[in-house]
Regions:
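An exposed, glycine/acidic-rich loop-and-rim segment of catalytic or binding clefts
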Residues: 1-341
């Protein structure tokens, strides 16, 4: 179902909203501005429960938490807003101090995407990112497909192709709270399990400052499920006020890389992906972000589980075998599936 809002987006045109429903009554909603995942209502014990943090549609351009947005051209950070590509230095638009975050000041989250096709259980959006966009080289054609299945899962597929070599790293920035996403209870009371043996330390600005580290004997060891609170703000988390680090996903696509469980264990979320890494962000700076009810969220109200490449990969050739630099004319394809049980 496609509808337009009575009010306008920053480009002066109405937002276009798409709603999908499955046979179990699960309802998801998306919009063309930023290809944003607006809402996810899952049936739990005979009632629909909102599990996605969100705000009023008209507030999306003003919030800075990237709620539910598709981010690019390069998700996460690129140090000093520049990197070497061949013999050239690519200078990007900085938007977080001297660094670039999530593609720059006018990243993919701040664009109107075209609704290409809307079916019974899916919607497909497209965007053309021109050569020089936020400093990146190459004309890039991007497609995002959201699919809702009757198994209560949401699958996100990213397809892209560039006519020049370019940095490319696409993800969705949804925040989950399986207990209370409307007001945002403390997500640290959830239990988390990660299928990951290595994580990437960063400095206080989110820039990698160390090689990959094994999780053993650290607070980043989630190979056995534990409450997020258990080792919170220990070790390499101190400089980021909580978890805001990337993990290398153990390559077993048929197995979830994430299992998130609500405090009373009445709902869980499994994440499967073809991506190489996962950024876990516990909403350490969510305070002041608007809610759907006109209130504001507090810090730690939701957890972002962003499947992607490692941050700053364009400046680290040793990580580019995972992903991060897209060759001209080659198809980019990544998928992530969020299963609610």
């Amino acid at each position: 179902m496609l509808k337009k809002t009575a009010f306008n987006a920053p480009d002066g045109q109405p937002y276009q909203l798409v709603q999908l429903t499955n046979s179990n009554g699960m309802i998801v909603q998306f919009m063309d501005w930023g290809v944003t995942w607006l809402s996810c209502k899952v049936p739990v014990n005979g009632e629909l429960r909102e599990v996605l943090l969100g705000c009023k549609v008209e507030d999306y351009p003003h919030q800075t938490a990237y709620l539910g947005a598709s981010v690019g051209r390069y998700a996460n950070r690129i140090a000093n807003a520049q990197f070497a590509l061949g013999e050239r230095t690519i200078q990007l638009v900085a938007n977080q101090g001297k660094h670039q975050l999530h593609g720059g000041k006018e990243g993919f989250d701040k664009r109107r995407w075209k609704v290409e096709e809307c079916g019974q259980n899916f919607v497909r959006f497209s965007l053309v990112s021109p050569d020089g966009d936020q400093g990146f080289e190459g004309n890039v054609q991007v497609t995002v497909i959201y699919t809702l299945t009757d198994e209560n899962s949401v699958k996100i597929e990213y397809e892209a192709e560039s006519d020049k070599d370019t940095a490319l790293n696409l993800t969705n920035h949804a925040y989950f709270n399986l207990e209370n996403a409307e007001q945002g209870s403390d997500v640290r009371n959830h239990t988390l399990r990660l299928n990951a043996d290595f994580y990437l330390p960063v400095d206080g600005e989110g820039i990698p400052n160390s090689p990959l580290k094994h999780v053993v004997n650290t607070s980043f060891d989630f190979r056995v499920a534990k409450p997020i609170t258990q080792d919170f703000q220990q070790g390499d988390q101190v400089v980021t006020k909580g978890y805001d680090q990337s993990f290398i996903v153990n390559k077993a696509w048929q197995k979830p890389c994430v299992l998130l469980t609500s405090p009373n264990e009445d709902l869980s979320l499994e994440v499967l992906t073809s991506q190489a890494a996962l950024q876990v962000y516990t909403g350490n700076y969510l305070a002041g972000t608007p809610t759907r009810e006109g209130d504001t969220y507090q810090d730690f109200s939701g957890i972002a589980l962003e499947t992607q490449c490692l941050p700053d990969t364009p400046n680290h050739p040793e990580w580019q075998n995972y992903c991060g630099i897209q060759k001209a004319g080659e198809r980019y394809y990544r998928w992530t599936e969020f299963r609610f049980k």
